[in-house]
Amino acid sequence: MKLPIYLDYSATTPVDPRVAEKMMQCLTIDGIFGNPASRSHRFGWQAEEAIDIARNQIADLIGADPREIVFTSGATEADNLALKGVANFYQKKGKHIITSKTEHKAILDTCRQLEREGFEVTYLAPKSDGLIDLKELEAAMRDDTILVSIMHVNNEIGVVQDIAAIGELCRSKGIIYHVDATQSVGKLPIDLSKLKVDLLSLSAHKVYGPMGIGALYVRRKPRIRLEAQMHGGGHERGMRSGTLAVHQIVGMGEAYRILKEEMADETKRLNELRLRLWNGIKDIEEVYINGSLEHTAPNILNVSFNYVEGESLMMALKDLAVSSGSACTSASLEPSYVLRALGLTDELAHSSIRFSLGRFTTEEEIDYAIEQIHSAIGRLRDLSPLWEMHKQGVDINSIEWSHH
């Protein structure tokens, strides 16, 4: 077993060797290096064919038509294109958007920008288990609502929203529905031929593909229109200009092909590993699981260890690569906005750790992690005056601290 152990697969994943192999075939003079928009010679045709194959591999995994896949530089750009593209195109119909407080920053910050441009956004608070209340969603819908954006799997707590029910509700009201599926694709089945989802953001680097490439699914029937945010040569049916990065797209395609083959077995394996981890640490005093144990992704476990500072716990777990909150916001010392939205106190939100497992995680690594967590929590609580007071039966919340 190699140390340190990587348990931060929701931040990014290593590229699968099979994916790297395919990508390398698209870089050098002997490979498929042409510009796919070069229609006048074989180098361009080969590149175009490689992209067509990848587009089909991605569409196959999610039950889409390959013509509905628009390549972007990643899920953040896909989120921006979906929200700004719809808002700009349909603004004469209405200027109201609905999302939730626990969305990824790429959604929340895009919504903030649209608010500055004159749109109105309703931010729904989730229930304490992280799920959105459909009645609240319906109550928030208005005649001028043009878009709902609610993610499939939350990147911090792994809670799974009922995108099928949300899609039905949106379709019945004639409202466009966007889903950020960055954390769910390849872990949970997605069939867009059955789901009433109009736009769906995808990433490659969360599923053993390369960074810097993603896609936006844009439904053709009923047809969804977007205003382009990137202008130029009119690539991707005018929705996203820019020369297509053949090696990255081929890598994404291969990653999605592997997911389609291996997803069923891998989901079962990850679920077992996640439960093994939880069963190994749930007997620690004052430990709480964040989110819902039933409606959850197979690979994410977010836990709060009361009376232990999350940052110091991460330092103590020097042989485990874990995070507090998501990588996109882990540089800030603010408590996680996702956990605060669930109603956690600052203290509990600060004491949370996200463990995310993946393709190369083993039982041996999980058992080692359990051992390390037990000893680190013991050591840190021995140093904690708050823990001592808690053990003496003092109600910490009732203490009035004096500020110096």
Curated annotation (Swiss-Prot):
The organism's taxonomic lineage, starting at the top: Bacteria, Pseudomonadati, Pseudomonadota, Gammaproteobacteria, Enterobacterales
Transmembrane segments: none
Name of the coding gene: iscS
Family of this protein: Belongs to the class-V pyridoxal-phosphate-dependent aminotransferase family. NifS/IscS subfamily.
Main localization of the protein described in the UniProt heading: cytoplasm
Natural source organism: Proteus mirabilis (strain HI4320)
MF term (GO), any: pyridoxal phosphate binding
PANTHER family hit by this protein: CYSTEINE DESULFURASE, CYSTEINE DESULFURYLASE FAMILY MEMBER
Pathway: Cofactor biosynthesis; iron-sulfur cluster biosynthesis
Residue stretches in coiled coil: none
Subunit structure comment from the entry: Homodimer. Forms a heterotetramer with IscU, interacts with other sulfur acceptors.
Binding site for pyridoxal 5'-phosphate: A75, T76, N155, Q183, S203, A204, H205, T243
Protein name: Cysteine desulfurase IscS
Source domain of life: Bacteria
Catalytic activity: (sulfur carrier)-H + L-cysteine = (sulfur carrier)-SH + L-alanine
EC number in record: 2.8.1.7
